[in-house]
């Protein structure tokens, strides 16, 4: 049957975690107050504000309090969908203004071209919004990589630690589990993907990283799909 699609995690796998933690997250924290104040009547932003109040169980929170909650979630690395949606919108402005480019490991840039030439489908699955993923790959250090991807998945598909999320991906891309390889640096994500029947491979870019009972690679250069 063989592998026909590769699903990749982003932070720690295709992009350096420090880029997320030291560049993107602080940028969103700093930009949130003005962004919300200027865009609070935009339908999408308004929905995110309402969802934040609901999740925080603070239905009467004013805009300043909502901003405070969202900034705290960033510091806690919460995977809340309204936060991730707002971060995607904020980062879009940052990329457009040339504040930063998307860090992508060079070995993945080479590999994504190789996989595409092999007619393999490539997907990304991240706790960051689909919009944020598209921005990362379209404004990458290696240029616009988006045409290499067949699709992207985020928290709307499910929690990355939940087997059902991977079952949902399989249903969406219409492939059997053994035709799909999931690559991530996080053991718990690999465990969930394996429970859904997917093939798995752990990316280990840091010698101090916790590993599990999975095939491991240190670079996409080592990932050969026959």
From Swiss-Prot:
CDD domains: HAD_EP. This is Enolase-phosphatase E1. It holds the Pfam family Hydrolase. It is an enzyme of class 3 (hydrolase). Belongs to the HAD-like hydrolase superfamily. MasA/MtnC family. Monomer. GO terms for molecular function: 2,3-diketo-5-methylthiopentyl-1-phosphate enolase activity; 2-hydroxy-3-keto-5-methylthiopentenyl-1-phosphate phosphatase activity; acireductone synthase activity; magnesium ion binding. Its EC number is 3.1.3.77. The gene is mtnC. HAMAP family: Salvage_MtnC (MF_01681). Pathway: Amino-acid biosynthesis; L-methionine biosynthesis via salvage pathway; L-methionine from S-methyl-5-thio-alpha-D-ribose 1-phosphate: step 3/6; Amino-acid biosynthesis; L-methionine biosynthesis via salvage pathway; L-methionine from S-methyl-5-thio-alpha-D-ribose 1-phosphate: step 4/6. It comes from the Bacteria. Gene3D superfamilies: 1.10.720.60, HAD superfamily/HAD-like.
